[in-house]
Amino acid sequence: MSQKDIGNKIPIYKLKAGKEVEDYYDEWTVQNKYDKDMVDWKYSGPQETIDLFKKHNSKKDIKILDAGCGTGLVGIELKKNGFTNFDGADFSQKMLNLVPENIYQNLFKIDLNQKVKIKDNTYEGITCVGTFTFGHVNPPALDEMVRICKNASLICFTINIGIYEEYGFD
């Protein structure tokens, strides 16, 4: 990501989880500003995550959850890389509304900081890009991800280094 608009990004890190975060992302969807900002910032999280995911998993038909899918940037990368069976979930309905058609099999709204209404052992893989950061998703969400995954599943996520240290992910 370039430093061009980093000042515009900093308010995200000052938010508290919950309605404040949802409202911020809802506002960010106006005129598709979120996707435009990701391009301007040269955000490579989705591509890098899927590159790592496919390095450790050769099966293209496993059931995957893109947790915190936003506008579908990771889903687009999954599809480009031949994956065929994945769902998307996000906290912001307005972000979900911007996901292109025919990317995900299912889209649903969830709060990753709460127990999610997904059965145990549902998924064989999870991607989670850009959600483990200040004011967003907290460490207990990892326990939920493990719960909804089958044994030996791959969970591939990005994490802001500051939150890794400050919130006790280590």
What annotation goes with each model-predicted range?
Residues C128-F132, T158:
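Residues lining the SAM
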Residues N57-K63:
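Short helix-loop-beta connector
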Residues L65-K115:
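Class I SAM-dependent methyltransferase SAM/SAH-binding core
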Residues P139-N151:
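A short glycine-rich, Lys/Arg-flanked "PGG" loop and its adjoining helix->strand segment in the class I
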Residues S2-H56:
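Conserved class I S-adenosyl-L-methionine
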